[in-house]
Structure formats: C-alpha cells, structure tokens
Amino acid sequence: IDEIKAYLAQPDIYRPFILCEYAHAMGNSVGGLKDYWDVFESEPMAQGGCIWDWVDQSFREVDSDGRWYWSYGGDYGPEGVPSFGSFCCNGLVNAVREPHPHLFAVKKVYQYIKSRLIDNENLTVTVKNWYDFTDLKNYTLHWNVTADNGNILAQGEVITACAPHETVEIVLGKVKLPRDVKEAYLNLSWTPNQASAFMDTNYEVAYDQFVLLANSKYEAKIDLPSGTKLERDGYTWFN
C-alpha cells in the first residue's frame, strides 16, 4: 500500500495504477482488502486490482468407502511426484459455485453504497453513492435500531435521490433508549426497487452497522477482586 501511495505521489504520472493480483483467496484470506480500497476510493489514479481467484479448481471424487470429497492437486499423479498440495483450492466459491465465507467479506468491501454515522443522537448518516451510472433512488434503505436484548426500538424505510459519485445526508431522527439497554445498534440495509436478471427485490446489495452510545443512566454491575480499581475511559468499540 505504501508503494501505491508513493507511485501516486509522483507529479508526472499519466497511467493508472492497477494491481494484477492484490489478494489471494486461499483459505482464511482476503482480510486486508479495506486498506487497499481506502486508497482506491481516495486516489483517482489508483484503479483497483484483481483477486486470485474466483472458483476452486477441484473435482468431486468418491473414496473407497463411497464418500465423496473435493479433490485437488495433491490427490493426483504417481506417488513421490511433487505437487502444490491444496493450492488449486483458492477461490471465493467452491467448484459448484457455493460461496466460501470470505466471499461475504469481499462483497462488504466492494459494496457501492457506503454510509457513515455523523450524529449519534438525532440519528444522521451520510451516504456515498459509488455507482457510476445508477442513482440511489433505485434502491430502498431499510433501517432499524436494535437493542442488545434483540428488541427493535425503531425502524423505517427511506428512498432518496443521489447521483453517481455524490453524497447525501439522511436524517432518521431521535430514538429513545430504554433505561435497561446497555448498547444499541443502527442497522442499514439497501435493496433494489426492481428485480433484475441477477437479483430480486429482497437481495441486499449493501449494509452497514453502527454502535450507538450506551445509555448513560445504566450502571453495569461488576464484581471486582479486592484492591482492584475500575477506571472509565469512555472508549467505545464500533465498526
């Protein structure tokens, strides 16, 4: 990433920076995509890159006990012949196109609708439309505030216009948290208004979740060992 930034800092560049393979989707992988995309989205000359690869290159075989399994490089060839072991199983989906868990991480980073919470009390978000040709009025925002006990405290739907590559501010309003709520979450989900060949109107194209400030009147009961001091630093973990 530092090398990308160094290239982009040159005053005389005229070609975009494209990474032919910036992530390898083998096993528990693709966890660092957001760091790259922070650069791609902030630097016009950073065009993007390619993930290796889309699908596991494997075959369905049956063992001597009649059980099927996905085979890969190490299952073939005479004994003693070098192979790359499981190297061929490096896709975002398996051989029959069923998603691996890390495909959902890719979808989250790649989503074209990205939100940011800017007001915790009178719930307000800014929404960036990263589509090149599609207005946000073609999608519906479904939102809710859910307490840590699972109860939905408020919910609604919003359709708003926002041209490609523009940002819009959406005010959802104040939501009163019950006294026994320690933490609440603002959940945002976007779905298309019209079905297409690739998705129906229930398909989630983008989502975000934000942790809201805990109810200041709620005091957690904490049993501390004798001589232990509890310090409150106001730190809140959020996504």
Name each region found by the language model:
Residues 1-126, 130-137, 142-152:
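Extended substrate-binding grooves/exosites of carbohydrate-active enzymes
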Residues 116, 126, 157-161, 171-173, ...:
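Generic structural detector for well-ordered beta-strands
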Residues 126, 142-144, 187-189, 229, ...:
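Residue-level detector of beta-strand face positions
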Residues 130, 149-151, 175, 227-235:
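C-terminal regulatory/interaction regions
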Residues 140-142, 146-184, 190-193, 198:
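Intrinsically disordered, low-complexity Pro/Gly/Ser/Thr-rich segments with frequent PxxP/GP/PP motifs
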Residues 186-193, 206, 238-239:
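N-terminal accessory beta-strand-rich subdomains and adjacent acidic, glycine-rich linkers
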Residues 192, 215-239:
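Beta-strand-rich N-terminal accessory domains
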Residues 195-223:
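Short beta-strand elements
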